[in-house]
């Protein structure tokens, strides 16, 4: 699991 990628995706979703 990539935290950096997850954070970027979450920020884009919001």
UniProtKB/Swiss-Prot annotation:
Highest rank taxon of the organism: Eukaryota
Summary of the tissues where the protein is detected: Expressed by the venom gland.
UniProt-annotated location(s): Secreted; Target cell membrane
Similarity annotation: Belongs to the MCD family. Mastoparan subfamily.
Principal location: secreted
Molecular function as annotated in GO: toxin activity
Physiological role: Mast cell degranulating peptide with moderate activity. Has hemolytic activity. Its mast cell degranulation activity may be related to the activation of G-protein coupled receptors in mast cells as well as interaction with other proteins located in cell endosomal membranes in the mast cells.
InterPro entries: Mastoparan (IPR013213)
Gene Ontology cellular component list: extracellular region; membrane; other organism cell membrane
Official protein name in the record: Parapolybia-mastoparan
Alphabetical keyword list: Amidation, G-protein coupled receptor impairing toxin, Mast cell degranulation, Membrane, Secreted, Target cell membrane, Target membrane, Toxin
Isoleucine amide modified-residue sites: 14
